[in-house]
């Protein structure tokens, strides 16, 4: 179907698809492994080791990735340390404890790739399993008469006035190297944690995540519920984050990065795709969403990726079904948002990450800096959005202080041309690129600005503290829009290898706070003249077994 005789552009597309497909399957070893949940501490640890140059090559912007992929990155670092390829120049103050903790976390996977020595009597197991219990105690005060406030990057959750408890159990099972299963039920003591009003929720128990993954020849097929984060952003990403409720998906992609046969010198590639069905309560009930992401790392210090989301179908929609609707839009050359069978809502994005080494006087930091960015389009080239950031993994030699600054803008079009209300919206699909009212991408939503700063410091081998500052404006194209000033602090204590305790506090001052008042069509109402002072305190205890 995809390689019928046609224009040159179609032939080039087919050739590219065939080359990438061959590369995906060129990795002969099947490596099915459970995914690390988003916001697992290992993601930040691996990113920091990569930014420090301890891990010399890693594709880390597409999440989740598996425990075995994480172990391969850790194995690269261990190998470089053993070969004395990492200079003792002060980076070890940060890298050594991180690498030690990662080695303990992924010891079974590291034994499988011969990166650590297997202890006597410790054999390779055909069935592997594990679990984690997490309980959170909340004490929230949401001011301004609002009672709730959306919680950023938390799977469709809200801060809710009063004391609440959230507890989940995450269990996983791996069978050989071809099958993995994950299940994560969750309890919330207050149903409004998952919605109120237009987004109302009536459940105290729900399935946070549950999926089955089959892998063979580096091709991974995953079916079930889960969350994804596609992009370089830390505080948010333009197209796909875990801000909205978890999606029920079919995912297909490469289990690990690969090289194209006979063109290995070009670098590493990775492909991810998914298909999901959205909720009933929207413009076109049960509309579909297809996403594809191609990541490319030509060299150790640079990574680039392209992402495209296509919303189509749904009850009473004239558009074709999958895969014809996708091919109809991918192959056309006359722009998007065509009527009839090609009727869709689309977003596209290109993102990059570059690691800049230390340069005396210009880049004075011991391990240099990471620069990253995203540039997105909503349906057309005249609907842009952008995100840019800088990450310094070690500010001072021999110290563990890091620093991050990130800026995101979905209000570019209004500032440049006066056009407003485009990002995450659509003239046909008027519930927009959202799920249960929440944007699939950045939590600031339409016509937003977001400035974010974070720094962390490891005080002891077991205790780390962090602080954030955030200024955000939402819906700047409306006469009344929201302005938020936020400061927060957190403390994480590793009680032992399997037990972690976190204490977090957030203060928010929000002018004209907004609440979702309709999903079909989407509408958000801002309380003019109201200033909400929110005090948000919570503790989290996580135990692995």
Task: Place the predicted regions along the sequence by residue.
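N-terminal secretory signal peptides that target proteins for export/translocation
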Residues: 1-10
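Bacterial N-terminal signal peptides
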Residues: 14-25
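N-terminal periplasmic/intermembrane-space "pro-region" immediately following the signal or transit peptide
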Residues: 29-159
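Short loop/turn motifs that connect adjacent beta-strands in outer-membrane beta-barrel proteins
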Residues: 59-61, 83-97, 116-129, 173-181, ...
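Extracellular loop and loop/strand-boundary signature of outer-membrane beta-barrel proteins
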Residues: 154-157, 194-199, 235-240, 278-280, ...
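Surface-exposed loop and membrane-interface regions of Gram-negative outer-membrane beta-barrel proteins
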Residues: 159-163, 181-216, 231-241
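Signature for the C-terminal beta-barrel architecture of outer-membrane proteins
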Residues: 178, 229, 249-430, 446-453, ...
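Outer-membrane beta-barrel "beta-signal"
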Residues: 294, 493, 531-545
